[in-house]
């Protein structure tokens, strides 16, 4: 039997109710919730934040990043690092405003078991709403898993393996775009991204 998976939940200290809600969702799905202290970008001066490259951001997006975007990005760095520090082979990363769909709870144990037997992936997006340039890989517990050649946006529900989290962190600085944009760049380059055809986790509750 596989060990109970951990879900690393990105959460600001000022939002305990959101953490409680996320914990209840994950516990009901037999996932151990682990809080990751979110980075509050509102407290930083981007002009003095060494990891951020404003010139590169302007070249890439035509504008500077917002403090909130930088905060979300650093929070995803922290979550990937926390997963690696756990020593686990596979881990979930969630933002704290998630809601699990019924299919998540029924299918995810088999999805995890299926992923554990493969090395041809780095990250799975469980919450994408728009998929572009994909090819079918397998149907697991009734859920279609796709190769996301153009990794989808939204990063509120991810599954990492160790190779993927390491690859993301290695490429993650300087910061010049939102976290989901960087995920798209890293995973499209490697072609090691997967996604579920239906979003199993929604956000914004």
Language-model segments: residues:
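An acidic/histidine-cluster motif and surrounding catalytic segment
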Residues: 1-94, 98-205
């Amino acid at each position: 039997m596989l060990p109970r998976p951990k879900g690393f939940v990105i959460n600001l200290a000022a939002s305990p109710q959101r953490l409680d809600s996320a914990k209840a969702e994950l516990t009901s799905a037999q996932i151990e919730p682990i809080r990751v202290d979110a980075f509050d970008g509102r407290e930083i001066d981007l002009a003095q934040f060494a990891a951020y490259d404003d010139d590169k951001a302007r070249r890439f997006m035509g504008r500077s990043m917002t403090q909130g975007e930088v905060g979300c990005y650093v929070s995803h760095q922290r979550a990937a690092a926390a997963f690696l520090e756990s020593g686990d082979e596979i881990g979930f990363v969630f933002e704290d405003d998630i809601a699990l769909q019924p299919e998540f709870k029924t299918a995810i144990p088999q999805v995890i078991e299926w992923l554990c037997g493969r090395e041809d992936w780095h990250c799975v997006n469980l919450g994408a709403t728009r998929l572009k340039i994909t090819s079918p890989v397998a149907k697991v517990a009734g859920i279609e898993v796709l190769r996301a050649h153009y990794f989808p946006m939204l990063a509120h529900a991810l599954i990492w393996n160790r190779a993927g989290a390491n690859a993301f962190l290695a490429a993650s600085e300087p910061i010049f775009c939102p976290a989901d944009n960087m995920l798209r760049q890293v995973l499209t380059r490697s072609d090691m991204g997967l996604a579920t055809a239906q979003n199993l986790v929604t956000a914004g509750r």
